[in-house]
Amino acid sequence: MEEKSASQQIDDIIKVQSDWRGKKLSQLRSLIKKADPAIVEEVKWKKPSRPEGVPVWSHDGNICIADILKNAVRLTFPKGAQMKDPKKIFNTRLDSKTVRAIDFFEGDSSDSAALQALILSAVKLNTQKERR
């Protein structure tokens, strides 16, 4: 049997969430893909406790990682500590030396422009690394 593409696997992860979290992850996914068409969808870190894996978006390295939590959808930026956040949308993992994250809760509105700016900043960090 042929393994599903990363995109199909993320579709399945979204479908399993029948509440607002699935809708939010779908919205975030669309925003990420619109920010830069060269961003690649992947599913990583499959394990017995999480057989479906974790949605990851990359471009010359990981850009952001999605987690569906009990009461939130978290978007983690592995290099977030190196990124400027003028709109202050990072709201968790603020003490980490490397990562920053955004927890989205039910009913939250998202600043799409600020989030797209963070995504593009993460892409820039990764692509600059490649040019050195």
What residue spans do the PLM features occupy?
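Charge-dense, helix-prone N-terminal extensions
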Residues: 1-132
